[in-house]
Amino acid sequence: MRLVILEAESLGKDMDLSGFSRFGEVTVYEKTTEEECPERVREADIVICNKVRMCSRTLSGAENLKLICVTATGINNIDLDYVKRHNIAVTNVAGYSTVSVAQHTFAMYFYLAEKLRYYDDYVKNGSYAASSLFTCMDRPFTELEGKTWGIIGLGAIGRKVASIAQAFGCRVIYYSTSGAHDDPDYERVDLYRLLKDSDVVSIHAPLNEATENLMNIETFANMKRNAILINVGRGSIVNERDLCCALREGLIAGAALDVLSSEPIRSDSPLLKMADDDRLCITPHIAWASKEARTRLIGLVQKNIASYLEGGMENRVV
């Protein structure tokens, strides 16, 4: 059995991939382009990938290919019609990053809400050493307890965030982007009500026709002026140009983004024009990537392979 890992770099250089060798001969590539892919998968029985396209252009010569393991939940890189026609099984992974993403959500919130960038700079640039006062209250902050935390998309991650927000003493409300979700533990509201009532809005929804550009200049105008927006869902749910406008015009107090419409960020992104604005926090799609989450992910991929080889259907999407 020949296994090919096409994008090991996307799992992190600190991860141990030796466990895959129990399934057969393993070839590891740090990264793979579409042009490089056909030759690399030509003799593979199992391909492990993340973002590189799996389609006729990359797979047409892979006559032995039986299984594609995607190291993510989304399978947008898979040509489903092609793999079905060629009887190639596909698995994904889910649930591995719930704790990590929830943790990062609150890290980003507190970074903005407690003005940590400003106060860290205040100490390190010498202003505190030059002060005659033992403290600094230039940028007042408020307590999270008693605030309303609005969640867009109450899946596993959304529910984890909700439970943590409750532990901080927040009232939690949520908006179901599909309209089908109903959770008795939390108050469900429409989008307008969520934006009007929430001091914090965090996005944990998938990208689809209903959510693309959901947050735009019109919806920002419905938010509280002191509200903070956090997007750890999908980048294109937030219109980034409109977000910059909303921040400049004071429609909202701050925004934190871990996902962007284009990743890596484009050099001409309007967000980069606000790089020195401490009301905006951007991280490079790292919310999912705690060491524990990546270790769980690798374990799930190995479990998927073992299940497939034993005739099982663990995490099969095709």
Pin down the residues of each PLM region.
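N-terminal glycine-/charge-rich "phosphate-binding" loop or analogous flexible N-terminal tail
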Residues: M1-A44
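Phosphate-binding beta-alpha-beta segment of Rossmann-like dinucleotide-binding domains, i.e.
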Residues: A94-T148
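Rossmann-like dinucleotide/phosphate-binding beta-alpha-beta segment
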Residues: T135-R225
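Rossmann-fold NAD(P) dinucleotide-binding segment
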Residues: R53-L65, L80-Y82, A210-L229
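Rossmann-like dinucleotide-binding domain for NAD(H)/NADP(H)
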Residues: N226, V232-V318
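Structural alpha-helical scaffold elements that stabilize or flank donor/cofactor-binding regions
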Residues: F20, E39-R40, T58-G61, R193-L194, ...
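Short beta->alpha connector loops at strand-helix junctions that form conserved
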Residues: E30, T71-A72, I88-V99, S176, ...
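An anion/phosphate-binding loop that grips the pyrophosphate of nucleotide cofactors and donors
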Residues: A44, A62, D197-S198, N226
